[in-house]
């Protein structure tokens, strides 16, 4: 009775692994990953359903088929966290691993072995080969060593090689790409992204999570909060925004300061693996004084306007709230326009100035800004950075030529031949120069040691 226990193992080794190690499969997977990565860059990620319904309507559909329903159904609104994108990464990593063990490591093993040519006809398969006087052998060996070749001798055969680094480079490239893939997958599973709009002078916990992985709970901060000490904007002389800043403190549950930094665009605050980016801004409120009353802080709400961003609030001017004025502003430069109940422009005031309206004095004390923070944690980033560092090293190493030269003394002739995996013209020039430099040297008796040995 024949056992079938070995059939799955045979299928794995003889069918599945060769398919995974096929370069064509790796190229197809890489192109698919690149295509979907581009789509994730072009299509806004992590937005609300209303956003996609407004920007990707069913009529007319983008490119004739791309509607909000297609985006949401396939997962193009969160490409990098979808099961199929992660599956592509895993499959690509598996293909690279199989290729490394099936092709690159055996190639390295073969390159490190001593390959002696014993018969003159073996030189016929080399792209570069010639015959010399046997007297040139000693000087040719010296030339090989001078050009940093490792020389091995067995009887009348010589094998020399250099540039084994060029065979290690592709393995490092594969390993680095696998490391990058692992970092991307780990970041998708354990990372999170939150967005917070925090008024100046207030404290808030990280709560508005817009994207998170299934294992991200440990990364979301629970024992500390963000305190905005101050938020301000620098403007150009033309009135355009130059840069906006947030003076942030990380505080624990007892309000003890754990960390503090002033951040701006491209200069984030990092704390315990969580990065806080300056992403947006808004106007939270306005502080006003009516006659000699205490200073009142009123919230300001964003309003729809064709000309840009605008914020507004309503200030009552009578105790029974039967009358009031509307305050509007477009920035934090301290200028506010005042309108009465009929929509008529009453005045334009700046911070510290007063205006008379409805028989009272209204003083603009301060505009209160809000900082928009993007708070992220991606535990896979160190892996990705390490992978890219290794990738650059591996690419540089791959450009090193692996060159091999064989010598054989037979039939009163010295057979010389060589090959390289890149830079053929440079290798040919080097070989010719070594042959020419040895043309006038005296002969050296060949070694008769039966065991391979490295010539010092």
Swiss-Prot record:
Keywords: Cytochrome c-type biogenesis, Membrane, Thylakoid, Transmembrane, Transmembrane helix. The chain crosses the membrane at residues 23-43, 82-102, 168-188. Its main location: membrane. GO terms for cellular component: plasma membrane-derived thylakoid membrane. The keyword Transferase does not apply. It is a multi-pass membrane protein. The keyword Transmembrane applies. One of its GO terms (biological process) is cytochrome complex assembly. It is found in: Cellular thylakoid membrane. Belongs to the Ccs1/CcsB family. May interact with CcsA. PANTHER family: CYTOCHROME C BIOGENESIS PROTEIN CCS1, CHLOROPLASTIC. Required during biogenesis of c-type cytochromes (cytochrome c6 and cytochrome f) at the step of heme attachment. This is Cytochrome c biogenesis protein CcsB. It comes from Acaryochloris marina (strain MBIC 11017). The gene is ccsB.
């Amino acid at each position: 009775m024949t056992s079938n226990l070995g059939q799955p193992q045979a299928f794995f080794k003889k069918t599945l692994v060769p398919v995974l190690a096929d370069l064509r499969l790796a190229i197809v997977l890489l192109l698919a990953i690149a295509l979907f990565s581009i789509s994730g860059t072009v299509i806004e990620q992590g937005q609300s359903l209303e956003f996609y319904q407004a920007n990707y309507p069913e009529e007319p559909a983008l490119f004739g088929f791309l509607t909000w329903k297609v985006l949401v159904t396939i997962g193009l609104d969160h490409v990098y966290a979808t099961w199929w994108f992660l599956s592509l990464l895993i499959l690509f990593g598996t293909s690279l691993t199989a290729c490394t063990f099936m092709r690159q490591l055996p190639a390295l093993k073969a390159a490190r072995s001593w390959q002696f040519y014993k018969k003159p006809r073996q030189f016929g398969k080399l792209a570069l080969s010639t015959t010399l006087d046997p007297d040139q052998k000693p000087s040719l060996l010296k030339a090989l060593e001078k050009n940093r070749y490792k020389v091995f001798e067995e009887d009348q055969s010589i094998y020399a090689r250099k540039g084994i680094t060029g065979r290690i480079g592709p393995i490092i490239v594969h390993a680095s790409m696998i490391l990058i893939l692992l970092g991307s997958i780990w970041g998708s599973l354990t990372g999170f992204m939150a967005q917070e709009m925090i008024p100046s002078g207030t404290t808030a916990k990280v709560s508005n999570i817009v994207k998170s992985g299934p294992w991200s709970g440990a990364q979301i901060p629970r024992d500390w909060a963000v305190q905005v000490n101050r938020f301000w904007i620098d403007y150009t002389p033309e009135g355009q925004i130059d840069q906006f800043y947030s003076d942030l403190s990380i505080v624990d549950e007892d309000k003890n300061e754990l960390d503090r930094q002033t951040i701006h665009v491209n200069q984030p605050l990092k704390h315990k693996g969580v990065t806080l980016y300056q992403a947006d801004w808004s106007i939270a409120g306005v502080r006003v004084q009516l006659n000699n009353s205490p200073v009142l802080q009123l919230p300001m709400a964003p309003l729809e306007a064709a000309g840009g961003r605008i914020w507004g609030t309503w200030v009552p001017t009578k105790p029974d709230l039967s009358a009031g004025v509307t305050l509007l502003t477009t920035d934090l430069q301290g200028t506010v326009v005042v309108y009465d109940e009929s929509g008529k422009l009453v005045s334009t005031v700046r911070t510290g100035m007063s205006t008379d309206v409805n028989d009272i004095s209204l003083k603009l004390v301060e505009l209160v800004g809000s900082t928009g923070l993007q708070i992220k944690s991606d535990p896979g980033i160190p892996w990705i950075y390490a992978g890219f560092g290794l990738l650059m090293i591996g690419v540089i190493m791959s450009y090193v030529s692996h060159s091999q030269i064989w010598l054989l003394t037979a039939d009163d002739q010295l057979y010389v031949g060589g090959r390289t995996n890149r830079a053929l013209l440079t290798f040919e020039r080097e070989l010719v120069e070594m042959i020419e430099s040895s043309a006038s040297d005296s002969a050296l008796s060949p070694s008769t040691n039966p065991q391979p040995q490295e010539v010092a």
